[in-house]
Amino acid sequence: MIYITGDCHQDFERFNIDVFPEQKEMTKDDCVIICGDFGGVWNRNEESSREAKLMDWLENRPFTTLFVDGNHENFDRLYAYPVEKWHGGKVHKIRPSVIHLMRGQVFEIDGKSIFAFGGASSHDIAGGILEPDDPDFKKKKKKLDQGWYPYRVNHVSWWKQELPSEEEMQEGIENLAAHDNKVDFIVTHCCASST
């Protein structure tokens, strides 16, 4: 069985047994796919104790947790996990059954082919993106903190990798071509702004 949900932003309450009782009948062969903004890999430099508890809690659910990335992920840390093959595509395993589905990959899950392509452009950056090594960082941040415009800090709360690279797009095209450009499902965080 495959279940799909949206943004979690590190809030996994929806996976409590009281909220999601279907899991009583699930096994690790069953999957829950989060369509971006997983948020479980967020702390700046390393896994925090809170993240470790959350990831261990997800690992102990009876199902396998899968996610594509959104625009609110710590890509420095996410991309530091080893790349592995899983069900036909490339992944990062956060835990044995907490798995990041990498962009441009086709997975065979529960008899279905699934094309995964995460990422999105941040809409919450009207105030701009600050550089932490800017000599005027504190002054700029203080000014933005007093205003209404949301902003992000490069490699702290925003990463350019939120948008797919040319290589990821090309790999996606090649992987789709290898499947005759036919899959059962496409899992992404956000549709193109041109649609």
Each language-model region and where it sits:
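Active-site-proximal loop/helix segment associated with metal-binding centers of metalloenzymes
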Residues: 96, 112-195
